[in-house]
């Protein structure tokens, strides 16, 4: 057991030393090429982030019309849509968590939908309990989190609990 562990550690160290040797032996052109590639990737990432923010990612906006809902979701890969009602304590709890997550997960669009002002949509998505969080991927409903059951049934669940649930259902990456 101990010898095997020592051998494993030695192998890891050997491979790290070899990688360092390769770096030292690399010419200036190769290092410059790596630097250029990394810079290009960083610029592409910044541009993508800018595009996502421009299309409302990172914000948690309220939708009050069905037409607006469809416009918001039709071109977006991942959407987390909270169907709620103003001045309802459990909906306000969900709003707090989703507003935090929206800023952390730009790959997903987070919206709040006023259920009472979008009756056709709420009916079509079979919204019977508020809050309900509808997870949409490529214009299809993947899952609906109804009430607080999946978060443990209590009002004091953490943002992390909801985040892990959204990750489990592939609503965030």
Give names to the regions the model predicted.
Residues 1-62, 67-73, 167-173:
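Non-globular targeting/processing and membrane-anchoring segments
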